[in-house]
Amino acid sequence: MSEKLDFITKNNLWTDKQRDAADKVLAEIDSLGLEMIRLSWADQYGLLRGKALSVAALKAAFSEGSEVTMAPFSFNLVSEWVFNPFTAGGGFGIDEFDELGGVPSVVMVPDPTTFKVLPWADKTGWMLADLHWKSGEPFPLCPRGIMKKAVKSLSDEGYLFKCGIELEWYLTKIVDRSLSPESLGAPGVQPDAIQVQPVAQGYSYLLEYHLDQVDDIMSKVRKGLLELNLPLRSIEDELAPSQMETTFDVMEGLEAADAALLIKSAIKQICSRHGYHATFMCKPAINGFSVASGWHMHQSLVDKDTRKNLFIPSEGEVVSPLGRAYAGGLLANGSAASSFTTPTVNGYRRRQPHSLAPDRRAWAKENKAAMVRVISATGDPASRIENRIGEPGANPYLYMASQIVSGLDGIKIKRDPGGLQGAPYGAQVPMLPTALAEALDALEHDSELFRSCFGDTFIKYWLQLRRSEWARFLDAEGAEAAEPTGAVTQWEQKEYFNLL
């Protein structure tokens, strides 16, 4: 009689590297005396969800995985059913989702290579998981699974994705956590936003004095990030009062997306423990916070075998021919990818001319008004392309996957980005979407490319999910409030400020 194989082995869900890491993780857990491990996964919004497992439960999960409800994928940000799970197919209206009726469980499969010890939580570790059906097949709504597919598509062509993370966010001091019964919200009812006050005054970019004013909390953030072995490069004072920027050294592929997820979660948790609130909401509805935050993604491709940067220009070039085609792909697909780079209603407040954020699909050399900014020099190994389109509240996996898919499309069909723009805000090129609804229409109209990687099921799901968010906003605030130059509404503040 053959020996029964465990779930992970039977379905071949771990690589040799993951199996080796699993043994080392269990030994480290034992030597450090850890008691709980947070096994987490990213939901559709890029928020971490999961369970805190005992060591015994984690050991079992290293063989059989750990079951978890897929209910969060049916909810919006205020835990209202977008998809009714008690109807046929779970309310998704997608043939492939017949098995989703009744909110079934999926299986969290731990990735031991992502293990960290949380420095701010007592005897606690942290690990990411992939989501699978009980059949062993990947769960099609899992954002990390989508990123893994995108990375593989690049690898199949002989390339590796390199990414530098540059996140802007707002740091505030908590005045009232809004925990009174009338402030808590309910399923489908937004809770009140946390009440905060700024930590600095005045608009003064890169002011060292502002950094010193927040050193007490930012030293704790710095310490936490470094103890997590995240490659922190800089902490900077951004233009608006209380606006920060954190940058990180270049990372590769899936590692970069995993890191972005942990970076945002770590900053929020550390700040909250010390009476501060960090938000990656693009533009909070707070007087004086008139500058929107961005997520600028520095990216390049390297040869899979030699690890040589393939964007390095030769004499007389702005960027290599491969890099030029990649930039052409980012530009050509910029509107269709917009709901992945800028997925919230609030994120489109940023798309205004002369705001250091792009409003059209232009590219330029060292110009921060452009969507695609080329940073390069002849023979420079750090040559790269920066896409300035994104908001910090974006899901890291979907944002990065959209870049890979768009850039690889440019390479495969040799897309020409046209001439460099000397004045991007006046360039005669297509405009970017100025509202979430417009971005979703662009994706639906030109979705074949993204369906090939994200999957037809996910694209259908995403369009319905985000359109319901837009409809809720219009119902609450009206069409006039959707103008990108308009004031940030209280609906946006309640929807995004606490969680993102």
Curated annotation (Swiss-Prot):
GO terms for cellular component: cytoplasm; membrane. It catalyses: aniline + L-glutamate + ATP = N(5)-phenyl-L-glutamine + ADP + phosphate. Optimum temperature is 40 degrees Celsius. InterPro entries: Gln_synt_N (IPR008147), Gln_synt_N_sf (IPR036651), Gln_synth/guanido_kin_cat_dom (IPR014746), Gln_synth_cat_dom (IPR008146). One of its GO terms (biological process) is glutamine biosynthetic process. Belongs to the glutamine synthetase family. This is Gamma-glutamylanilide synthase. The lineage of its organism: Bacteria, Pseudomonadati, Pseudomonadota, Gammaproteobacteria, Moraxellales.
